[in-house]
């Protein structure tokens, strides 16, 4: 069997034990195989069969393997249509229907901070002038302390900003001497917290939650469904949940319905309301 097939067979065997979904990892399997090769080298193991034996005799290694399966891929303004819908439909509706002037948003699985900072830019530069009395508090969580450190630093390669509209890039960033682009201080009011979604979540309630390309892609049922239910419980009635481009909410989570005219966005039904 070739090394690639060996790795695929190993992932198909190991991922279910971590309550992770092999189909979700199919497109990024080469990244995981590269990480596994590095881990084998660090342990001085000859092949994946030896690593299987290591997992059998050293249960703590499963935690290491689980960490290797984290996919911190993100970029600014990922899925332009989502941010357009948030700007034109969702956030204005949340402001206009809120019983309070301060909205709360949560970016779940925020990686290096591109998503929460994109939201902060859209809010401050596009929506705050329309709603001067409203405020938006943003909490962002991830399980990886290294990516959170990069998020707090707020420094990015020019390539990660390529999808960001020009006005947001010009007003939101300053180019440094080393070629990095640093988000300006006025847009850095994001509360970054290290949390593993499987173990803890912010209390909420939130008006807006972004959970894209994490739970619904990489976790297997029933853990996936349980996490989505817990996430939905942290949404205010009428609040919005944003998912990834190829994701959909499990049908058993009945309190979430598609937000009309806003692809990839769900709305939480009001308590006791059964219609759309």
Where are these regions (language model features)?
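Conserved AdoMet
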Residues: 2-106
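A structural alpha-helix within SAM-dependent methyltransferase catalytic domains
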Residues: 87, 120-124, 232
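Conserved class I S-adenosyl-L-methionine
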Residues: 100-117, 137-139
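Extended basic-aromatic, gly/pro-enriched interface segments that bind polyanionic ligands
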Residues: 108, 129, 134-210, 214-223, ...
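Conserved SAM-binding loop of SAM-dependent methyltransferases across substrates and taxa
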Residues: 112-130
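A short glycine-rich, Lys/Arg-flanked "PGG" loop and its adjoining helix->strand segment in the class I
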Residues: 225-237
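Conserved beta-strand signature within the Rossmann-like core of class I S-adenosyl-L-methionine
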Residues: 237-245
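Core SAM-dependent methyltransferase catalytic element
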Residues: 250-276
